A protein has these predicted regions:
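Positively charged, helix-rich recognition surfaces that bind polyanionic ligands
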Residues: 1-181
Length: 181
């Protein structure tokens, strides 16, 4: 799973004995409509409604992920190990609001941890360094958007997290023929 403020990318991978994988299912949860601003104070009824609506929908997304885990009989759920502190990101007021105030990352992570302990699958937190870059380079194409490509890379890392020498994938020039730049 690739967690972003506006989108959650999900991919379900199946690995064989040779550590090769195929993508069984991929999905994007679009949360951008939930992140609108009310242009009112945080104590206003509309602002409280939007905040509660956002939290409810994020919890529903977690339940949908859990349904997919049960349907595909997954044994591991791989997420990014994020520890982002609130700060000025120097990309504008709207971006800072989205990353620091609106994004309920811990709500999603804690709910997924709770569901994994109830339903018995392993939750693996992986280092997200360059997951978007590597994911787009190796798996990105017109049918696989950015958040799906990085979720594939996060899943690949999570599958072999404790194996030595498996963090970065093997790169070949054939991966570049799908790229548009």
């Amino acid at each position: 799973i690739d967690l972003n403020p506006n989108y959650i990318g999900l991919s379900i991978l199946e690995f064989n004995k040779h550590d090769e994988f195929k993508v069984l299912h991929k999905q994007v949860f679009d949360l951008s409509a939930l992140n609108v601003t009310s242009n009112k104070s945080s104590t206003d009824k509309l602002s409280k409604y939007l905040t509660n609506k956002r939290k409810f929908e994020l919890i529903q997304v977690c339940y949908e992920i859990n349904k997919l885990m049960n349907y595909w009989k997954c044994s591991k759920l791989c997420i990014e190990d994020l520890s982002i502190k609130s700060s000025n990101k120097k990309q504008g007021k709207t971006f800072n609001r989205l990353c620091n105030n609106v994004w309920n990352r811990n709500l999603v992570v804690n709910k997924l941890k709770m569901l994994s302990s109830i339903f018995g699958y392993e939750l693996v937190e992986v280092n997200p360094v360059y997951s978007s870059f590597i994911g787009n380079l190796l798996y990105g194409n017109e049918n696989t958007p950015d958040m799906i490509a990085s979720s594939i890379e996060i899943g690949r890392r999570g599958f072999k997290k404790y194996s030595k020498g498996w963090f970065y994938p093997i790169f070949s020039i054939e991966h570049l023929n799908e790229q548009w730049k």
